[in-house]
Each structure stands twice: as C-alpha cells, then as structure tokens.
Amino acid sequence: MPTINVNKVDLERLSNISLSDKMIEDRFPMMGVEVEEIFEEVDKSGKKQKMVQFSINPDRPDYLSVEGLARGFRGFMGITTGIQEFEVLPSDIKVTVEENKTRPYVAFALVKNVLMDELVLESMINLQEKLHWAIGRDRKKLAIGIHDFDKVKAPFTYKEIKGDEIKFVPLGYEDEEMTPREIIEKHEKGIKYAHLIQDDRFPIIVDVNGEVLSLPPIINGTLTKVTPTSKNLLIDITGTEKEAVEETLNIIVCALAERRGTIVSVNVNGKKYPDLTLKSRIISIESINKKLGLELNPGEIIQAVKKSGMDALYEDGNLIVKIPAYRNDILHNVDLKEEIAINYGYEKFEGKLPSVATTGSKDPVEKKCNAMSDLMIGLGFYEVMNLTLSNQDTLFEKMNLKVEEKDYIEVLKPASIEHRVLRTSILPLLLETLYINKHHSLPQKIFEIGDCVIIDENDTETDTKCKNIKKIAGAITHPLTNFNEIKSSTEALLREFFEDFEFENYEHPAFIPGRCAKIIKDGKEVGFFGEIHPEVILNFELEHPIVGFEITIE
C-alpha cells in the first residue's frame, strides 16, 4: 500500500483538533488508515518536526494528501459532517485541444489564492507523485502538471508536435533549452518515460504566446515552476482514460481548496472543468442492517453517512445518498455499507460465536493439489505460477485455436493489452514461460496448478454465469523429448489421483496429428497430452521440441 509522511502540526491545523500520539495510533486505524510510525525529522530550517507515516488503501486516493486525510478525519471525529461542497467560480479561460492520438483526454482547472508555503508545496508535490502511481500507473494512464498561472497567459493549446519542432527549458535544466527529442535522450525524466512517446509525436501544452507549460507525460517547463511564493495554480491532467483524468483533477482541486484556494473553471473545447457535481446512489435500510448484522434506525445510519463526508435523505425505507466528486471509490452499494460500518464504529460491533460448532480443515481440492504438486516435483518438474489474466494472442492465436468471443471472458477496462482476458487454459502460459527462460540450459520441465475461468450458461448459483475450474498442466522441452516421455509423466499422475481412466486418439490444433491423446474418465474428457506442433513452437519463438499435458482437477 502507498504510504505518506505527514507533518503532525499541519495535520492538527487542517483537522481542527489537537492530536496526541495515542489518539493518532488509536483513531486513524478505526477509519481504515494504518499508522506505520511516528517519528522526528529535521526540516530545511534545521528545526525538528514530528512526522506521522500512514499507509493508505489504494481505493482511497483522496487520502494520499494531508488535506484529504484531515478532511476525512474531521468527519470521522464528528467535527464537521456532511458533504463539504466546493464552489467553482466561472472564468473565460479557454483551452483548445487539437487531435492527440497518444494522450487524447485532457482536463484543466485553476485554483487561486492558495495559502502556499514550503509545507504546502511539499504536500502538493507528494500528492502529485502518489497519484501518478495510484491512478496514473506511473504516468501511463495519466500525468499531472501543476503550474504557476501568473507566469503564462491564456488561452492555452494542447496539441501534438514533432520531436524537433520547438525548444524550451525543462525543469532540472534551469538555463538550457532542449527539444522534446533531446529531452527523452538526455533528461533524467525524459529517459525514464520515453517509452510513453509514440511515433515521434509529442503532446505539448503552450500558452497564447507559444510558451511551453508542459511536455506531458514527461516534464514541465521551468517557466511555470511552482515555488513557495506561488498562489495561483493551473492544473492539467492528460491521459488515456477520460474518467480517470476527470476524477484525478477533482481530487487535486479539492485538496488545494483545503488550503483556502478558490476553484476556478477552465473551458476545454467547450466543456467546463472541474465538474464537481454530486453523485447519488439509492440503498435500502433493510439491506444495510442485513449486511452489518445490526438494527440501526434511519437517523443512526444518516449520522454515519454524514460522518463519512456524504449526505443522505430518507424516503420510503431507502436512503438517497449524495456522494462528493472526489470520492471515486464508491462503485457499489456495498461500498456505502462499508462506509456506514466504519463511521458507526467497528468497536461497537459485538462478537458472537456461531450457533453451529465447526472444525476447520483443509479444503479437499487444495489438499489434492498439494499432493499433486509434491508428485510432480518428485518427477523432476519445477513449479511455476502465472497470472490468471492473459490475452487472446497467447491463449488462442499462438495455439492455432479458433475461438469465438462468447467462449471467453474479456476484461472491460484492462490495465494492459497483455492482461485483458481470463485464462481458459494453463498450457499456453507454460509455453510463454519456456520462452522467457529459453536462455537457460535444457532440459526444462515445468508445471502449474491453478484456476481457469470458463463461461457456464447453465450456472444458476451466480449472476456472472462464470465459474473457476482447477487445472494442472505440464511441459517438457529438450532436443530428444517425445510422446512417450509426456505419456509416462501423465500416467504417473493419473494412476495416483484418478481411477478408471483411458486414452483415446485426439486431434488438437496445437499438437502434431497422431501424437496427441485425450484422457477419458467416467465417459467424459478431463484432459489431453502429446507433442506440440512445430508451428505452435515457432509461434512462441521457441526452438526445441516440446511435449505437454493439461488435466482438469475439479
């Protein structure tokens, strides 16, 4: 989990409460924020300052700054409850967005009259970097720029340029002008994030005079560098996902508003940012009490909702809950139930022994899997573990399989193109593992036991119509491996853990015709084994013969 270091005096000032070390250690964990340590450090002036290090859950990016953390703590302690609404003043500041294929989404906002000092500047920079990781995936999904607005002049333009089209002084090079291409070749940040630039097309933000504010997602210009004397801050967020860009902007402007800043809108191609419109959800009182095992009345639940920084209205057995724009973690009603539990107080829940006595034991399937693992290791195999997420290319195309979309589950918003499908088979991932380890000596014998996910339209137990099935797969590669070797290993496994099995000839696109068999148990196919087809071997950029098997355990 990400951690943040917070100045204790600053936390007290923003929380509007005096905090003892014991109070910090007792109360913050009850609102879901772990206290790692309380320590002292020497600041730039040579004075000792008491600091607190917190661990922040990834689902609460608004807690990644002392401003957001203090806001949440004020509500939790009942100092200020309900929604803290932030006014957005209108302006005539405009941003023109030209076509940008690399990072197509952008949002801007201005926060004026921020009470800035060294402490606030450090907090702002830390929030920026933490959000780069927590939401931005190290700037791949989004990048954040914060500028001294008084150094530039509106309107602004966001566009793409070629690598040698413009020169400016980047942060860290106080007097040396560089082109974007030179930045990714010489600048520390440029080298680190050069992989995010495609086809020599560089996103850039300039003002009306052509002055460069930022070269996202790499570096800002020195011209707009924020200092402790800056008070009017222009924020830009650029990225590949519109929702993430807008939510991140909301988190930052609300944090700066805690420093007495005034939020001012910016017109981006006709749309005004930031959009701090409240979200709403409807949830029943009955479902809340059922989930929490309590009998709370509407008033008690509304009080807990208000302590979480939200508002609620009771109507016909339901609550209409209003959610602030900086809360991007409320995705489902179960999230509201968790917030109610936290702010009602976990310490108020009474522990009860179950009415039925139970004795813990190992899951029979896991027990069987552990025994299988021991046997495979005894046969000279090394165990590997791959992700359940994969992609169509690895699972199907490289295996010469033709599969329709309805036969597998695809992730709606994948983090990367390599991880966008839930695997239906383990063997392709073992071939991928062999490719990664092709520089190691032969023979190589590997296996994996793990879950695959399939679509089951006849499943009546879940809403998803999907279920996990446990499989085991193995692969061997060396110049002399053959059908008999994999048959021997497969039979050893089957004799130990399966009864009354038999083999039948099997035509599988990933295997050499005539050198593949399927495993039949109780009249059903439970697996297969054989020699991998040379075309498949080449698809995975491997060189030596490979044999493999895959068996369904459960």
UniProtKB/Swiss-Prot annotation:
Example of a GO biological process term: phenylalanyl-tRNA aminoacylation
Family annotation (Gene3D superfamilies): 3.30.56.10, Bira Bifunctional Protein, Domain 2, Phenylalanyl-trna Synthetase, Chain B, domain 3
SUPFAM superfamilies listed in its UniProt record: Class II aaRS and biotin synthetases, Putative DNA-binding domain
Cellular-component GO terms for this entry: phenylalanine-tRNA ligase complex
InterPro entries in the cross-refs: aa-tRNA-synth_II/BPL/LPL (IPR045864), B3/B4_tRNA-bd (IPR005146), DNA-bd_dom_put_sf (IPR009061), Phe-tRNA-ligase_IIc_bsu (IPR045060), Phe-tRNA-synth_IIc_bsu_arc_euk (IPR004531), Phe-tRNA_synthase-like_B3/B4 (IPR020825), Phe_tRNA_ligase_beta2_arc (IPR022918), PheRS_beta_core (IPR041616)
Disulfide pattern: none
A Pfam family per the record: tRNA_synthFbeta
Cofactor: Mg(2+)
MF-aspect GO terms: ATP binding; magnesium ion binding; phenylalanine-tRNA ligase activity; RNA binding
Keyword Flavoprotein appears in the UniProt entry: no
Annotated residues for binding of Mg(2+): D329, D335, E338, E339
Protein's cellular compartments: Cytoplasm
Family, per entry: Belongs to the phenylalanyl-tRNA synthetase beta subunit family. Type 2 subfamily.
Subunit structure: Tetramer of two alpha and two beta subunits.
HAMAP family: Phe_tRNA_synth_beta2
Protein name listed in UniProt: Phenylalanine--tRNA ligase beta subunit
Annotated gene: pheT
